[in-house]
């Protein structure tokens, strides 16, 4: 199993991440699709090729093709939106009167349950650090009666995946020295 490959690749100083990754992969707070879609989306958001390959290996056995592509789509569209809305927010309203002019059709028609796509978008936004997008996706989820504990679990997952990506990059970099 590829999650096991990731855990084995983590150095001793990342033992907490190894344990956290194991526990989040066995969460009961998220459905299987929510869990694996979030793992794929957040792995893609970290830009760590090794992590994305390993998680995808397992995810392709669990997710439908539509769900797998939607998770990758969440990472891609939020990669654009997080930069745009984070930057726009930092400019103190100077550009609020201008139309974004960005296509975002996948958000309205992701090919999976809207709540799942929103959850993945929230998790990616946590990694990318866009407060505007975090607030917007959290509100959409809460308005859809998604439990706070489910939302919080997606945020926990994003933080774990981000830390694992950092530890793998560090280990790979130091192995090349």
From Swiss-Prot:
Reactions catalysed according to its record: N(6)-[(R)-dihydrolipoyl]-L-lysyl-[lipoyl-carrier protein] + a hydroperoxide = N(6)-[(R)-lipoyl]-L-lysyl-[lipoyl-carrier protein] + an alcohol + H2O
Keywords on record: Antioxidant, Disulfide bond, Oxidoreductase, Peroxidase, Redox-active center
GO MF, one annotated term: disulfide oxidoreductase activity
Disulfide bonds: 130-133
Active-site residues from the entry: 130 (proton donor), 133 (cysteine sulfenic acid (-soh) intermediate)
First-tier enzyme category under EC: oxidoreductase
NCBIfam families (alphabetical): ahpD (TIGR00777), ahpD_dom (TIGR00778)
Oligomer and partners: Homotrimer.
Family: Belongs to the AhpD family.
Protein name: Alkyl hydroperoxide reductase AhpD
Organism: Mycolicibacterium smegmatis (strain ATCC 700084 / mc(2)155)
Gene designation: ahpD
